[in-house]
């Protein structure tokens, strides 16, 4: 076994759900992989930490997307590895119907945060993070079109549109 194989990977989970904005799923993956490639070529082997990126959903069923692409989750919330970082992609159009149907993801976010995960919400994906209560008392942002609704739904969040 080489030293590279012995190094624990940085565990990154990206939540996937219906109506997510596909670019807020794919762009972070591309940027993370580019950073990983740069780090691998510019660090000593024993200093390099590989990334393990998993698409996490409430079930393993394919998730259709308005682009015509289906998203295949790697694991369910109940089997997902402990995450160092969780990315919550933006939601296409009105986030409220999506948030209301994703209580298992909201619960998982809260549990993961309690276990030490860092969480990044992208645009309207912050509605899921706020629904978990993780933004209460903290500054946050969302898509400008939903800012007023966000303020009404999550009055404890310091919205910075």
Short names for language-model regions:
Residues 135-161:
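A conserved active-site-flanking secondary-structure segment within enzyme catalytic domains
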């Amino acid at each position: 076994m080489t030293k590279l194989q012995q190094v624990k990977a940085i565990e990154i989970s990206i939540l996937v759900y219906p109506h997510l904005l596909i670019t807020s799923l794919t762009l972070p993956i591309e940027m993370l992989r580019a950073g990983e490639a740069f780090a691998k070529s510019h660090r000593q082997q024993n200093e390099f930490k590989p990334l393990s990126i998993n698409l996490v959903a409430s079930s393993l069923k394919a998730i259709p997307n308005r682009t015509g692409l289906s998203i295949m989750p790697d694991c369910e919330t109940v089997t997902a590895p402990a995450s160092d970082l969780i990315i919550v992609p933006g939601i296409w159009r009105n986030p409220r119907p999506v948030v209301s149907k994703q209580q298992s993801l909201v619960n998982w976010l809260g549990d993961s945060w309690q276990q030490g995960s860092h969480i990044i919400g992208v645009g309207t994906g912050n509605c899921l993070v706020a629904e978990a209560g993780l933004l209460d008392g903290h500054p946050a942002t969302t898509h400008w079109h939903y800012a007023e609704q966000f303020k009404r739904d999550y009055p404890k969040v310091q919205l910075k549109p």
